[in-house]
Amino acid sequence: MQGQKTIILKRITRWFTVTLVLGLALASCGNRIEPLEDNWESAVPFQPIPQGLVSIRSADCGVCHQEIYQEWLKSTHAHAWTDLQFQSEIKKESSPYLCINCHIPLENQQEYLVTGLKNGDIYQPVKEKNPQFDAAMQQEGIGCATCHVRDGNIIGTQVTNNAPHPVRVDSSFLSEQLCITCHNANAVVTPELVCTFQTGEEWKAGPYAQKQTCITCHMDTLERAWMAGMPERLSHRHWFPGSGIPKRKGEQPVALEGLNFTPDTLPSTYSDADSIRYSITLTNAHAGHRLPTGDPERYYLIDLTWLNAANSDTLSHRRFRIGEVWEWYPVAKKISDNNLNPLESRTFSIALLPPAEGTYTLHAEVTKHRMTEETAAYHHLTGDYPTYITVFTGEQTVTVK
């Protein structure tokens, strides 16, 4: 009897031990840490301060490179981190950490470093405090060091013997390929989260890819002194002109409009039996990518309106839209897309059958939008956050006899 008890106890002990080991193994598998694999999952590694400099903050670069710094301050790059829309987005529970890697690209700018993903889940990053975090540099978003500092060197395109810091000439690094690392972020992260910035692919598929690059249009050249007291040399503008929609009310960013507008010229008089037709043609004449491009929430509106000139009553109105339409939940999918390809033209028309003799005014307006007003309200972006600008207006008055 005693022997049977001993055997039973041994079996129970063995079963418990095996169960415990298996349980620990399963628990370990359930919390495995997977390494980061894609380049957009990680920040640019920490960059030390090059010899001769006090920091790699843009504000300190601007002490010498004053004109370039003032241009950069007007750019969207300078607002990449502080932009109210972006700040609203990253506060969402559905927003993964990796979005910040294009808005504050250097490890120096990130308060926490991500070393892996728990169970491969982007919503469970393994973080550790960054001992070299620079809070002031974080506020600068995409600054000078993003493109011009690597491994203790200032990266440039020309040899200079006057710089107080080491310079490494690397035109390939400072090519459009650097732009595309962020301006072609295109991935299905989760079923309801799609990153779809395809400007780089649009440029490659367009008519200018073999002869012009991002830099051709967005960093035009001029001869100037790189810093006060130095001789003039070939330089690039650093305000990176784009949509022209300001990030704050009162600001005036440098715009680069890719569209040409060709409105009809109407005769001054018509008979009361005539139907009056007005058209305006929009052509993507200047962009090497589609318009709009970048954020899929951007769009153009074309509003054509006939008014009674005597009392401003609206007699006819048509609204057209150029842009993508997406459904974001429960699965993100593109519903439609009528963005203008490079060199593509599209004509929009409105007709009026005059109700009586009199004077009538045709009003045409084209506006460029960052997002809908509904989206802005959802993100609490009202008041000081402009959501659109007007890029064309025109009026013509006709008399009907």
Whereabouts are the PLM-identified features?
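Extracellular Ig-like/FN3 beta-sandwich strand-entry sites
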Residues: 275, 345, 357-361
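A long-range scaffold signal marking pre-active-site subdomains of enzyme folds
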Residues: 58, 66-71
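Short, aromatic- and glycine-rich surface loops/edge beta-strands on solvent-exposed regions
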Residues: 304, 359-367
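Short Pro-Gly-centered flexible turn/kink motifs
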Residues: 341-350
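C-terminal motif of bacterial Sec signal peptides marking the signal peptidase cleavage site
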Residues: 26-28
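Bacterial N-terminal signal peptides that target proteins for export
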Residues: 4-16
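Primarily the internal scaffold of c-type cytochrome electron-transfer domains
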Residues: 32-52, 71-94, 108-111, 115-333, ...
